[in-house]
Design a protein with these regions (language model features):
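Conserved catalytic submotifs in the C-terminal HATPase_c
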Residues: 48-51, 70, 75-84
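Short alpha-helical segment of the dimerization/phosphotransfer core of two-component systems
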Residues: 22-27
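Short beta-strand/loop element within the Bergerat-fold HATPase_c
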Residues: 111-123
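Short helix-loop "hinge" at the ATP-lid/N-box region of the Bergerat-fold HATPase_c
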Residues: 104-105
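Conserved micro-motifs of the catalytic ATP-binding
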Residues: 12, 42-47, 85-88
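Short helix N-cap motif at coil->helix boundaries in the Bergerat
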Residues: 54, 135-146
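Conserved glycine-rich
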Residues: 175-176
């Protein structure tokens, strides 16, 4: 009767409110990302660089995704020296790598492993984010850093196509470079190189 109808209405309203909140969060993320990219483009951001411990930064990123990893039954594996320092703006660079790790979560199934490794090279420092997910379609590989690019092959319907372009902009603002390597059905690897970290 009436009470049942009311229950249905209440749950519908709650569901709608939940969806609206999700949508608002999505729009807020979009606006924030757009503002950040625009400011980076305009050179309006002054990076506050300090010698940062890379292992500490990566552990913070792992912690940021710990809840999601548990929920989705995925694993983050960290590997690298505890004593490596990178001259960078910790907040900005953490956000860039965060976006790459989020991308790995968005494109992997339950049980996936996401590896974050870092090492010193003769010319600088390298950070790699690698997953064993669905991989990137060959048609998409050259477009993934384009703003608002949405793959027609992707199952991710919530993405806004700004996470990776923002990551690239931040890495390049640090004098770094990012490359992607992917095999369909096998996974994706993002390699970030920073030249001579003491002089970035």
């Amino acid at each position: 009767g009436l009470l049942q109808d009311e229950d249905i209405e209440v749950s519908s309203v709650k569901e709608f409110a939940g969806l609206s909140e999700q949508e608002l969060d999505r729009i807020e993320t979009l606006v924030q990302s757009l503002l950040k990219i625009t400011r980076l483009d305009a050179g309006a951001i002054v990076l506050e660089k300090n010698a940062e411990n890379v292992a500490d930064m990566m552990r913070d990123i792992e912690l940021h995704f710990a809840y999601r990893a548990r929920q989705e039954k995925k694993k983050i594996i960290l590997s690298g020296s505890d004593y490596l320092s990178l001259f960078c703006d910790r907040d900005w660079l953490s956000e860039a790598i965060d976006n790459i790790v989020k991308n790995a979560f968005d494109h992997t199934e339950s049980g996936a492993v996401i590896g974050i490794t870092w090492r010193a090279l003769p010319s600088g420092i390298q950070i790699v984010v690698k997953d064993n997910g669905c991989g990137i379609h060959p048609e998409d590989i050259h477009h993934i850093f384009k703003r608002f690019y949405r793959s027609r092959f992707s199952k991710d319907t919530q993405g806004i196509g700004l996470g990776l372009p923002l990551a690239k902009a931040v890495i390049e603002a640090h004098g770094g470079a990012i490359e992607v390597d992917s095999e369909l059905g096998r996974g994706t690897s993002f390699t970030i190189n920073f030249l001579i970290p003491t002089k970035l």
